[in-house]
Each structure stands twice: as structure tokens, then as C-alpha cells.
A protein has these predicted regions:
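Intrinsically disordered, low-complexity segments enriched in small residues
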Residues: 1-183
């Protein structure tokens, strides 16, 4: 019977090692060790900022800031999705996952989880995919259009999308368009 099998599986999972208890953001150190935590538009496989981009920083802040782990959808037993609050305890974003930390963070030489969370929130508000946007910002930085690691400038470019600015529209159209325009 399916329900009995599901119950047994759920129980075995919950009693076993919880390798994803911190979500996919918890694999940042492993990816860095394996040279797959892309840095500076994929020109390097390791980030010197791995400690400040590690998803463990998110979990460490739960007690002080609020937030927490939750299930990404009804019925999910893993509960590896996170809710991130800012330093004042206000909701900032949710589901700050490995891919977002990698592309909006290390790929752009952005140094901290808080900076990535700010960019993630802007992407959410603008309806932008964080992976595509991080890749486009990386191309912009790599081509000299913005300083590496300048999260404030990256935020300004994302905000420019709503005003129809040239650079903002280019980033909003994605990495292929950004690559074509930036050569």
C-alpha cells in the first residue's frame, strides 16, 4: 500500500542523517572545495569569501534575527528551504539557495549572505530569475561595466530595470543579451 510505504519512508528519513537540514546553501563549502563554486564569472572555481557566503551563516542568524527552515511546499518532509531576515529582524527573502548564492554572490565576487539576500529580494520583486541575473551581472562585471563585488552598484542596475535604463534593460534581458552587447 502506497500510504504505508510513504509512512515508512518518512520515518526512516526523519530518523536518518539530515544532510540537507540547512538547505542547499549548506553545500557551499563542499562546492568550493571541489572547485565548482564559481567565482568572477566562472574564471575561477573557488571563492575567497566562502566563509561569509556559506549557508551556515543563514542558520547561525536565526536565533538573533528570526527566520528559520521550512518546507518548500505542503507535504515536503525535508524542510530545507530557509526564511532570511535582515539584521533588524525584518523579513528579507526566502529560499536563499545554493544557486542564488553562487550566481548572485561568488560569481559576482559579492562577499556576504546579506548582500546576496538584498539582490535576491530585488530579483523576487522584479520577477527575475536569480541564476540568469547573476550570470548577466557577472558578464557585465567581467567586461568592465561594473566593479567586481559592488553589490550596491548591482542593486542600482536591477532597480534601473523598472525605469527602462539601458544597462538595466540589458541585464533584464539576460546573460545572452548582456554577452552580445558587452562583446
Amino acid at each position: 500500500d502506497f500510504n504505508a510505504l510513504t509512512k515508512r519512508y518518512t520515518q526512516a528519513y526523519l530518523e536518518g542523517p539530515q544532510i540537507f537540514k540547512h538547505g542547499t546553501s549548506g553545500v557551499v563549502p563542499v562546492a568550493n572545495m571541489l572547485n565548482t563554486f564559481v567565482y568572477k564569472n566562472r574564471t575561477e572555481g573557488q571563492s575567497p569569501d566562502v566563509q561569509t557566503l556559506d549557508g551556515a551563516r543563514i542558520v547561525e542568524n536565526f536565533d538573533m534575527r528570526g527566520g528559520g527552515m521550512h518546507n518548500c511546499m505542503t507535504g515536503c518532509i525535508v524542510k530545507c528551504s530557509n526564511i532570511v531576515h535582515d539584521a533588524d529582524g525584518n523579513y528579507k527573502t526566502s529560499a536563499l539557495e545554493f544557486e542564488t548564492i553562487t550566481l548572485l554572490g561568488a560569481n559576482c565576487a559579492i562577499k556576504t549572505i546579506d548582500e546576496v539576500a538584498n539582490l535576491d529580494r530585488l530579483c523576487d520583486e522584479l520577477g527575475l530569475d536569480t541564476i540568469e541575473t547573476g550570470a548577466a551581472l557577472g558578464v557585465l562585471m567581467d567586461s568592465g561595466g561594473m566593479e567586481w563585488g559592488d553589490s550596491a552598484a548591482a542593486a542600482r542596475v536591477l532597480e534601473e530595470i523598472t525605469r527602462g535604463g539601458e544597462t538595466g534593460c540589458m541585464i533584464g534581458h539576460g546573460v545572452v543579451e548582456t554577452g552580445k552587447r558587452r562583446g
